[in-house]
C-alpha cells in the first residue's frame, strides 16, 4: 500500500510546450528606385518611425541606379537608420524587370516617332513641300538625348518591406540627391518608373510620397550656388 502511494506521489503533471510559428504569411512585392552608391551604403541602426500611410505588411521592389554591372544586394538585418532603406530582404531581378523596362521604352519611342513624323509631315505640307522636317526631327532627338536618364541608369530590384510609403519616399530622395535630378522631365521620368513597375494598388502611396517631397521638403529644387 505504501509502495503504491509512493509511486503516485512521484508522478508530476507536465504542461506540453507551445511553440509559436507565426502566421506564415507571405508579403507582396513592390518596386522602388536607388542610386548605385546608396545601394552599397545601407546603414545599420535603429528602426524608422512608422508612417500612418504605411501598410501593415507589404514588399517593395526597387530600381537601383548603377554605373557599372548590377550585383546582387543582400542583407541580414531587419532595420537600418532613418536615412537608409528599410527591408527584411533585398534581392535583384534584373532579367525580367530590365526586359519589361526596355519594352516600355521601345513602345514610347515608337509613339514619339509617329507623332514627330505626323507633325513634320504637316509642317512640310503647310510650307509647300519643304523638306526641313527631317532636320527638325533630328534636332528634337538631340535636345531630348539627356531625357530618360533615370530609366537608363536604373535596375529593378524586388524588396520585401513593412513600410512601403517610407521606402518609396526614401528611394526617391536618394535618386534625386545622388543623381541631381532637378529637371521636370527627369522628375516625371522618375515618377513614371515607380508607377509603371508597381501594382496599381500601390500607386496612391507612390503619388503621396512624390507630392510630399515636392510640396513640403523642397527637395526637387536645385541647391543655391550662393554660400553664406
Swiss-Prot record:
<keyword id="KW-0963">Cytoplasm</keyword>
<dbReference type="GO" id="GO:0005634">
    <property type="term" value="C:nucleus"/>
</dbReference>
<feature type="region of interest" description="Disordered">
    <location>
        <begin position="1"/>
        <end position="21"/>
    </location>
</feature>
<keyword id="KW-1070">Brassinosteroid signaling pathway</keyword>
<keyword id="KW-0805">Transcription regulation</keyword>
<feature type="domain" description="OVATE">
    <location>
        <begin position="157"/>
        <end position="216"/>
    </location>
</feature>
<keyword id="KW-0539">Nucleus</keyword>
<comment type="subunit">
    <text>Interacts with GSK2.</text>
</comment>
<dbReference type="InterPro" id="IPR006458">
    <property type="entry name" value="Ovate_C"/>
</dbReference>
<dbReference type="Pfam" id="PF04844">
    <property type="entry name" value="Ovate"/>
</dbReference>
<keyword id="KW-0678">Repressor</keyword>
<feature type="compositionally biased region" description="Basic residues">
    <location>
        <begin position="107"/>
        <end position="120"/>
    </location>
</feature>
<dbReference type="GO" id="GO:0045892">
    <property type="term" value="P:negative regulation of DNA-templated transcription"/>
</dbReference>
<comment type="function">
    <text>Probable transcriptional repressor that regulates multiple aspects of plant growth and development, partly through brassinosteroid (BR) signaling pathway. Acts downstream of the kinase GSK2, a negative regulator of BR signaling.</text>
</comment>
<keyword id="KW-0804">Transcription</keyword>
<protein>
    <recommendedName>
        <fullName>Transcription repressor OFP8</fullName>
    </recommendedName>
</protein>
<dbReference type="GO" id="GO:0009742">
    <property type="term" value="P:brassinosteroid mediated signaling pathway"/>
</dbReference>
<dbReference type="GO" id="GO:0005737">
    <property type="term" value="C:cytoplasm"/>
</dbReference>
<dbReference type="InterPro" id="IPR038933">
    <property type="entry name" value="Ovate"/>
</dbReference>
<feature type="region of interest" description="Disordered">
    <location>
        <begin position="36"/>
        <end position="143"/>
    </location>
</feature>
<dbReference type="GO" id="GO:1900457">
    <property type="term" value="P:regulation of brassinosteroid mediated signaling pathway"/>
</dbReference>
<feature type="compositionally biased region" description="Low complexity">
    <location>
        <begin position="92"/>
        <end position="101"/>
    </location>
</feature>
<feature type="compositionally biased region" description="Low complexity">
    <location>
        <begin position="54"/>
        <end position="79"/>
    </location>
</feature>
<feature type="compositionally biased region" description="Low complexity">
    <location>
        <begin position="1"/>
        <end position="14"/>
    </location>
</feature>
